């Protein structure tokens, strides 16, 4: 007689084992109809799952945060079902849920086409409308291997054969299609109403380039049409804002084959880079950091001591000289420990804060490179704090305050905090990790922050707090981090003289606010759609003369503004003023200053703000005041 405890604490007793669907029905027919799955004692299950002992149960409906995962997983199976209906000779492989959707990989004798996607989506809609039940069965591994071999599904048979002998596997059937899956899935295909196939790509079987190239179909699925419409609009906006396209349009940077994953900064792009660097340098100074510079190439022996050689070698660029092995640094931390170790330190000096704009290199796979967002060479605002255990909480709290102020200045007001915990591959014992994770939890709690925990996603040397920014079109970007490291200082021999004259190992906090400057600039470009705030804009204003008569005055205005420290250009070409205005508007210049005979005679400028906003004619000093205000407040002008 199982007793089922519901989320509100109420209990229901049943005379025999009962399905999740039956519990939902006993509560109400509306809930039974809305049920997509359940959570039994913390585990997501199908509505067909049988509860045979006292358990806690939450019914998953379209209002539950877990609903999207079930719907997307089920829609991936619906796609595979449709492929087998339209292309019976295709073989199915795997189809997981990913962020905002799913994909499924297939083996087929010819490439799928965009027209095939249209036909498949139509078939998926047709199959969903049949509202066929999704039925779970369990069978022994060997029996499942034979089942899929008989179906001609060799990839599925290979997957199951890799499972240890003697284990059972679960299969899900809908109509004529059966797939291997752990589940859970929706109770019937009729629950799948909102989906779209997005694109085609290639993928190697099991991610190994030695294996066959499969065809990957990406899709998205949602609970409500308005959510999907918003997502598709966001994708459309993302394409318009793509920093690679804007980088070319605005003449900021470029890439070329001779330097994969490395950036050629043009003058305008480098201007943005320098503004970000100088801003972050002031943050270092205001927060009590001493700026340092460590070598980019270090001996293999140091990387072995730090743990990078064993845990990160595949991502490092290595070289040899005079029978010694070296590596380009992928991280700055070992170098900062060497600077710390160059002298003897007292507890009175702690916390000791080092900061560097450290240039790092990581051997990223060529297929993973993506504009400024994923590169092989980048610069971090990388800092390391050497402190005692008792100082961790106050240092993390101070960092948290600083990081939020920085993001506010760059235009990000929504920031989510996540705590990444120990990964499977790591240095240090569990006691050290317990201490490090508890220290970060305590600091966040003391700072009054809410946070989400991410098991397994910490760095190999320590847990970390991550700061995730939401941009202007709703996407999130992980930027800032602060990590507790009890391991590396000990591995590299860092010490300080304690109050009792004993030698102790300091705690090291790894911290970065923007992270990779290159990536952060890519995020800024996309967040602002290229309309950089005045303080960051490579060119803050352009002076345009209406005719040759006003060319000298235009030059005078430009020179006056440049002497006051503003980034100003002049356009004295013999072109129509409307043409020049349009051309510079496409370059997203914050302010255009139009001068003709009247302005020359009255020492004024006609000001047009970005987006075609006419601010009228004003004395040059008045425009300077407006420019200074926008720069100091780190704002606009916003495009209309």
Swiss-Prot record:
Uppermost EC category: ligase
The TGS domain, residue ranges: 1-61
MF annotations from Gene Ontology: ATP binding; metal ion binding; threonine-tRNA ligase activity; tRNA binding
Chief subcellular location: cytoplasm
Superkingdom to which the source organism belongs: Bacteria
Record keywords, A-Z: Aminoacyl-tRNA synthetase, ATP-binding, Cytoplasm, Ligase, Metal-binding, Nucleotide-binding, Protein biosynthesis, RNA-binding, tRNA-binding, Zinc
A Pfam family recorded for this sequence: HGTP_anticodon
The protein's role, per its UniProt record: Catalyzes the attachment of threonine to tRNA(Thr) in a two-step reaction: L-threonine is first activated by ATP to form Thr-AMP and then transferred to the acceptor end of tRNA(Thr). Also edits incorrectly charged L-seryl-tRNA(Thr).
Subunit structure, as described in the record: Homodimer.
Homology family: Belongs to the class-II aminoacyl-tRNA synthetase family.
Protein name according to UniProt: Threonine--tRNA ligase
Organism: Polynucleobacter asymbioticus (strain DSM 18221 / CIP 109841 / QLW-P1DMWA-1) (Polynucleobacter necessarius subsp. asymbioticus)
